[in-house]
Each structure stands twice: as structure tokens, then as C-alpha cells.
Design a protein with these regions (language model features):
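Short beta-strand His + acidic residue motifs that chelate non-heme Fe in jelly-roll/DSBH
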Residues: 110, 118-123
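Non-catalytic, conserved peripheral segments adjacent to functional cores
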Residues: 1-105, 124-126, 133-142, 146-193
Length: 193
């Protein structure tokens, strides 16, 4: 696998080595050993999958401490624009984002560490989205930033009249009104100290 660094430290794009022939293709989608060697130590404990139609926008989600989550995300059917926003107070990249297109054709994965809000928009007719999490879902720690926050400068590539958001996601605060529970100076991976 090739690890591509982004403009924000910790956010990385992973391109697997894909073997293609007349029968189709094969690739190793995850190796704990290689991930820890090339990215960071992490212990994924939950895999999730969603199916969404064109225009669906999910996010920007996170879980508050002590239930923070890292995510390793990919699109196995269709195409999405995947986005992570740095919400660590004191970070030199606070409020900045990285957007990457994930698709069934490029097989890319995107690693979103703890301390980031995450979301995606479906660009194809339908999309099947999978993600690994390193902490279990904790509804009491659920949080989010408004996916429509224009101050973030995200081009979601979805016309406003085509965007489909959940009632919960519509109610998220904009970044300027948000008091982040994450601090850049605090180790968000204490289990690996």
C-alpha cells in the first residue's frame, strides 16, 4: 500500500496495490501490521457500512472523549467526496479540511484520526461506504459540525436543491459557535503511550 500525506498532519490517503487480470482484480484492503508500520498504531474494533443515494450528505461527525474514534473509510460502490475537518483547539490547522474522492474505481482509503470531524457527500447514483472505527459507537458522545458551514470552504459538489441531510445533521452548529472537546496539546491515543 502507498501512503499519501495530505496538507494536514495525520490525515492520509491510502492507495492499495491492485492486481488486475482477465478475471478481475484483487487487493489487500487492510493489514494491521502494514498500517501500523506506515501510518500509526491503532486497534480497529467496529466495521460499519452505509448505502446512500445521490445528494446524501452525512456529517460532519465525531465522538467526544473518552469515546473518540479514528476512522479508516472507503467507498466500495459508486463515488463520494470524503472530508475531514481539524477540530483540535490550538492546532495550526484548526478549522481546515482535506477533501478526497473515494470510489469503487480508485480503491482509495482515507484515514481520519481522532480530533477530526468527518463527513461525505454521495456523487454517484448510489454509493456503498465502509469504515473501520477504533472505538465503539457511543450515542451519548455523538457530536457534529454543520456540513453547511460556509466558513469551512468545502465544495461538496452537490447543488443545494439536491442535498439530502438527516434532521440530526441539519441541527449541528457552525464551527464559530462550537466549543471543541479536543485539544491539540493532549495525546488522543493514550493507550499507546
Amino acid at each position: 500500500m502507498e501512503v499519501i500525506k495530505t496538507a494536514i498532519e495525520g490525515l492520509v490517503i491510502i492507495e492499495p496495490k491492485v492486481f488486475k487480470d482477465a478475471r478481475g482484480y484483487f487487493f489487500e484492503s487492510f493489514s494491521q501490521r502494514e498500517f501500523e508500520e506506515k501510518v500509526r498504531k491503532v486497534n480497529f474494533v467496529q466495521d460499519n457500512e452505509s448505502m446512500s443515494s445521490y445528494g446524501v450528505m452525512r456529517g460532519l461527525h465525531f465522538q467526544r472523549p473518552p469515546y473518540t474514534q479514528s476512522k479508516l473509510v472507503r467507498c466500495v460502490k459508486g463515488r463520494v467526496l470524503d472530508v475531514a475537518v481539524d477540530i483540535r483547539k490550538g492546532s495550526p490547522t484548526y478549522g481546515q479540511h482535506v477533501a478526497v474522492e473515494l470510489s469503487e474505481d480508485n480503491h482509495r482509503q482515507f484515514f481520519v484520526p481522532r480530533g477530526f470531524a468527518h463527513g461525505f457527500a454521495v456523487l454517484s447514483e448510489t454509493a456503498v461506504f465502509q469504515y473501520k472505527c477504533d472505538n465503539f459507537y457511543a450515542p451519548e458522545a455523538d457530536g457534529g459540525i454543520s456540513i453547511k458551514d460556509e466558513s469551512l470552504g468545502i465544495d461538496w459538489q452537490i447543488p443545494t436543491d439536491k442535498a439530502l441531510l438527516s434532521e440530526k445533521d441539519i441541527k449541528h452548529l457552525c464551527l464559530k459557535d462550537f466549543d471543541s472537546p479536543f485539544d491539540y496539546s493532549v495525546n488522543l491515543y493514550p493507550e499507546f503511550e
